[in-house]
Amino acid sequence: MAHLAAILSVPREKDYATIAAMPIYAYAILVAGWLLWLTPFFRARQSEKPAKQVDRRARWGILLVAIAYCLLWQGRFWERSPRPWQVALSIVFFALASVLSWTGARALGRQWRIDAGLSADHELITSGPYRFVRHPIYTSMLGVLLGTGTLITPWWLLLPSLLLFIIGTEIRVRIEDNLLASQFGDRFAEYQKRVPAYIPFPK
């Protein structure tokens, strides 16, 4: 009975103070960061080319990445008050993610798609951010994960989230690379040897 009464009781003033611990600017960073990152994908989706070949196994990677994102929000983030360095780092991650999503979607044009697939007149894109990484969209997704996690997620949730993201992204990268290799042969092999997948380390 005491437990039920505690659940039904009206929150006290200090409870509201706890709920409001996360400052409004942190919410603004989250909303702005996600919206700026997502907008080019919604626009690209409207002009997506039909695919002639799709490998649906990549959806397992999509599922793992989705779970990774969900983990970011499982902590009581509304009670967290991020430190200045966390706020600054989060803004940097979101900014980089947004730049990559806009430039990557623009370079892909109508070839952008969620599934791993090839269109009938598919082109090998090596311009824009594709000069530095073969999958800049995935780099931008990593930036959003780190931008969100730095701001609101405790480390014991951020680490498994990052691990799931890497596993899911590796699945997608390998499947997409195999599709591109089957289409472009030696030309893609040379590009793959020269340019890293989604983390811009020099090869």
Task: Give the location of each predicted region.
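Membrane-anchoring alpha-helices and their flanking helix-loop junctions
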Residues: 7, 12-126, 144-203
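Histidine-centered phosphotransfer motif of kinases
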Residues: 127, 131-139
